Amino acid sequence: FHDNGIHVGVTTNGTLMKRYMPQLKNKTKWVRVSVDAGSEEVYQEFRPHKSGKSQFNTVIDQMSELIKDKKGKVGYSFVILSKKDKDGKILSTNAVDLTKAAKVAKEIGCDYFEVKPAFDIMHFLDDQGDDVVQTARQHLGDIKNLETEIFKVITPVTIEDFKKGISTQPKSYNRCLVSELRSCVTPSGTYVCQYHRGTMNMKIGDSNFHTLDKIWNSDRRKHILEKVNPKIHCKFHCIRHESNLLLEEMMKGKKIDQLEDYDFFI
């Protein structure tokens, strides 16, 4: 892909990066490592290894090696997670490690530290309770002070809903304009978006048998996009929601500034 001008981004848990270090260093635009901890103990609790030994230091060492002479950006990802008992009571949370993790990310030379709320299997925000939210809120305030010109702390727009305990995201529009700009290509087929991958009535084609150009201009894709109604089909939190709101305003005539910031990863 890289040799043909296709930009490649990789998300990984980081445990086996050493096997592909040359490719990760030289053929990616970005690598984002899902760590979700800032210490061996918390890592083992939320990302346990079958050996019983925490892989935290192994992952951090491999990230450090990647960063030494990387060509693209390297990010440290932290999803806020909690463990619950059978009645839904919170037993523990990795949110206590947020500040430690951000400091580790900065120390090893990551370009950014990303904090995200957890979602359930249907893409609705996971309700983790007031105590976890308060813990995360405190740490998020602290780690913003770690930012510099070359190290950023980033959060998705959904973090604000997480802070407020809002688990759904109602939509005011009945079409998805973002789906005219992107899709989701997988081994099982090509879908309207990543949220509907695996859903047969949202499958616009199959790149195993047809070119993307043929899929994109097919009657099947046109028919499916006419049926997609975010008010009905997308009550979960969608990362493209703000983009859709802006596109709807642009369709009504709103003018926006054009920036020289072309990026294949829209």
Name these PLM-found stretches.
Residues V192-Y195, P230-S243:
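Local cysteine-cluster metal-coordination motifs and their immediate loop/turn environment
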